[in-house]
Amino acid sequence: TVNHNRDQGMLKTDRLNQFKVNINNNNTSFRLNLNIDLSKGIKLVVNSFTTLDSYHGPLEDVRTAYSLAFYANPVDFAPTYPADDTYNWPHLRFGKSRDSDNPYALIQRGYVDRSRFSTINRLEYIQNLSFLLKGLEFRGDVSFSQAGYYSNPYMTTPFYYSLLDYDHVTGKHTLEALNPDEGKRTLLKGSGTTTGSNQLAYNIKILHTAAWKDHTTSYLAVLSGQESLQSTPNSVLDGIRRRNLGLSMRLSYGYKERYYLEGSFGYNGSERFAKDHRMGFFPSVGGAWVVSKEPFLLGSSKWLSFLKLRLSYGKVGNDGIIDTPRFVHLPSIGQDQPSGSFRPGLGQISRYRITGYQNNDVTWEIAEQANLGLETKFFNGLFEATVDIYQQVRHNVLANRTVIPE
């Protein structure tokens, strides 16, 4: 599918302006979803979504201009003045007082072009392996996403005037230039903004489900990897791709649709820590009991439709503990600005100093979590209630110590 939207504003460009300032916003999106049966039991899934946004509009925020217009006094100045005998060459003569701004000049003095794009593409391979084991399935997928944004402002310096004299009989007026040396009609490019990022991720999955008599089981194993890069790095280290690797498994068991047990773990790797601390093991276990399906509660099913108790405990790891430095196990060295020398006759010198000491003991921040929950429904779902008792304890929290305790 292809979709395109175009929105325009209601700002009028002055006839003496050499560029358009009205808002013009275009949005285009493309979406593709394909399911391809390669052969019996083998499927290929393709998903793609792309958006393109382009914006042209006034340099100043329209909300700011409207706010200034609300408080502007029309007695102080006119939006623009006609030419007088002195300032009669073709240009916009914006009115202004020394104590307030002209909102019309803010809108007409320049424009900004902005563009934003993003694309997400995913390819998945699915194969049914029931010929090896009933309920066994293999999945592998790779996805690529990219996003970018740029903004370029273009501006002039308005010519501001005040009304010095006005003859009510002849209608002749005299203007006073408030900024004759600073005003310019030439468009100048301001400081632009450019950002971008891309990410590549892949997953390999093994799934298995089975059911026999009163028993049900399910198994899932996932090997995942991810790498990302910012297109506008601030340093050499920021220009290196960020990478993560993980292996996770989950096994669940159910009996008579009343009793459930589940165990899982994640074995994750991060590049941010020293060699001995890059891998983290994070297990979890949980169970649930659907009390409403017990024989001793079947007589209350008219008013108690559902009652479930659940309990879980697990650990979750976090490697995004600090933005800077990126690699906490590497020292950081910075250069000071030139300053006075330590010895006469040497002039100014630049000094190098350690801005961050390496720490080989920093590792994953661990959130240890426990949860006790209750879910219930009354009168066939007319009333529902969910109650959770939750506790979380964090370990290995990284913090800056400003005062060393005695």
Task: Outline where the language-model segments fall.
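Extracellular/periplasmic, surface-exposed regions of secreted and cell-surface proteins
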Residues: 33-38, 42, 48-52, 71, ...
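Functional cleft and adjacent loop/helix regions within the main domain
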Residues: 77-87, 389-392
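The feature marks either
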Residues: 88, 92, 98-99
